[in-house]
Amino acid sequence: MMKSSRRSFLLNPLSMLLTGLLLGIAARLFDIYFQNLGEIFSQMAIWILLGTLIAIYSPTKKAAMGNIFPFCMGMLVTYYVTAAITHGVYGQSFIIGWTVFALVSPIMAYFAWMAKEPGAFSKIIATGIVAVSVVSSVLLFDRLRLYDFIIDGALIYILFFKKIKRSQKRKDWNE
């Protein structure tokens, strides 16, 4: 299977929904059974990294937006359904916060996709993505932890150093 056809098989709204559904369940089970993984997957930084990867590897801005929304909504729904089934404790403010995050994720995906385009504006966007990841760890979760440095280091590498091949030929419906 060619790399681009493999990418389109993996990066489409249905597969992203399924991935989000599975990661939502996994994140909740990590909270229960694997405290360290639960801690990592409760942080916004890991979801910023995953969302950025989905967006930048999507073939177009429109595809990035269409891929990230079902991913985030799937993750959100199954996380809280699993939390309810397992009698988990969670606050309404967390539900509201993550719902807002999921609802604005297509806009964030649009800009994340743009971060890999040439030019100064793309570097400003990339810097903003990393800054939001760092600041969210400090403001929402008190401090930067070792895994935050690893996640943010991965973001820096992906956004500033990793080369992404994008096709020059794009279909109108997918731009």
Question: PLM features: residue spans?
Answer:
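Loop-to-transmembrane alpha-helix initiation sites
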Residues: 98, 142-155
